[in-house]
Every structure is written in C-alpha cells, then in structure tokens.
Amino acid sequence: MKVHVKAFATFREVMDNQVDMEFTEGATLRTLLAGLTGRYGGLNELMFATPDTLRDFVNILKNGRNVHFLSGLDTQLENGDVIALFPPIAGG
C-alpha cells in the first residue's frame, strides 16, 4: 500500500516536504515513523522524547484527523492515506 507524508515547519528542514512510502498490509503509524526516522536521521530527535513517546505538542494527522484521537502510534495505515506531520509551534 502507498501512503503520502507531508512535513511542515521544522520537520521540513530535515526531510523532504512530501514523500510517498510503501508498506505491507497491517502497517501502523509506528511503522511509518520508524521508516522516516531511519531515512532522515535528524527527524528522530525532533519528533520523539523517548523511543515510544512523541514530544509534547507534536501533531500527526491521518487524513485530517489527529491520531491522538485514533489509536496513537498504533493507528493502522490504509492505502492512499495522507499523513501530515506538524512540530510544536509557538507564537506570542
């Protein structure tokens, strides 16, 4: 299956703006992130507080829905999904 990934803000500085990735059936968001952090070394430090915990305020959307309200890192991926990666953003 093919999944389209879009990166925003500081995530774009360490990876391509958009990338298509292919997975076998049963892949999860955790699988996708492992592939991305393996390909783009600096992404792991920006995204994860611990190996199994995203940094606070990192937002990941699957087809426009925050994965926090789905199954988190265990959210199942499906063919054609669009995953958007947003780092913490602060303003003042």
Can you describe what each PLM-predicted range is?
Residues 1-91:
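Ubiquitin-like/PB1-type beta-grasp interaction modules and other compact soluble beta-rich domains
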